[in-house]
C-alpha cells in the first residue's frame, strides 16, 4: 500500500469512528510523531463534519516525561486550540519504584489513569497512534477494539515509521525537538 492509500484508509476509519462514536471521540495524544499524525487527520475529519468543533485530546503525564515533550504538548495545544485534558496517575512518585517492574509501572502510571480518565470524561472512543510495526504483539490487532465501556481505534495501524515521517515532512507538521537528537520514541525518562 502506498502512503496515499494508507492515509485514505486512515481517514475512512476515522469517518467510521465519527459515525459510530460522535465528535466526543478524543485522540490519545502523547506529543509523539505517531499520535500527532492521528491528531491532524482527526482534526480534518472533524472539521469537515462539524466545522468549528473543538478537537479533544487526552494526554497522559506520568510525571516522568521529558520536559521537551511537555513543552511541545503545551505549545501545540495552545497554538492549535485543542481541548486538551492532561491525565496524571494517583501515585506518589517519590515513593514509587519507577521502572523496577516495567509492566507494573506502565499499569500504574499509564493504563489505570488513562482508563479512569476515559470513564470519568465519558469518552465513547479513543483514537491512538498505535502502529503494527512497533511491536509483534500489535501486528495482529484489529484497528478497532472494545475496551469495555469505550472503544480504541488505531487508524494508522498499517503505517510504518517512514510513512509517519514522510507525512510530517510533506504536511510540514511540527515535532518534538528530541527527535532531532536521535530519539525514535518519546516514552518516560526512566525507560529510555
Question: What feature does the model see in each segment?
Answer:
Residues 1-192:
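Nucleotide-activated chemistry modules centered on ATP-dependent adenylation/adenylyltransferase
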Amino acid at each position: 500500500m502506498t502512503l496515499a492509500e494508507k492515509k485514505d484508509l486512515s481517514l475512512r476509519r476515522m469517518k467510521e469512528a465519527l459515525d459510530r462514536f460522535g465528535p466526543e471521540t478524543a485522540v490519545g495524544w502523547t506529543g509523539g510523531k505517531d499520535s500527532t499524525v492521528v491528531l491532524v487527520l482527526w482534526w480534518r475529519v472533524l472539521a469537515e463534519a462539524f466545522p468549528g468543533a473543538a478537537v479533544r485530546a487526552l494526554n497522559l503525564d506520568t510525571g516522568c516525561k521529558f520536559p521537551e515533550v511537555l513543552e511541545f504538548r503545551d505549545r501545540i495545544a495552545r497554538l492549535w486550540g485543542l481541548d486538551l485534558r492532561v491525565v496524571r496517575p494517583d501515585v506518589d512518585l517519590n515513593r514509587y519504584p519507577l521502572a523496577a517492574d516495567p509492566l507494573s509501572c506502565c499499569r500504574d502510571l499509564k493504563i489505570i489513569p488513562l482508563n479512569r480518565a476515559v470513564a470519568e470524561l465519558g469518552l465513547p472512543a479513543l483514537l491512538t497512534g498505535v502502529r503494527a510495526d512497533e511491536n509483534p504483539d500489535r501486528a495482529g490487532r484489529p484497528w478497532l477494539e472494545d475496551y469495555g465501556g469505550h472503544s480504541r481505534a488505531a487508524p494508522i495501524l498499517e503505517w510504518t515509521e517512514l510513512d509517519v515521517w514522510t507525512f510530517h515532512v510533506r504536511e510540514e507538521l511540527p515535532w518534538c525537538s528530541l527527535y532531532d537528537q536521535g530519539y525514535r520514541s518519546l516514552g518516560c525518562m526512566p525507560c529510555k
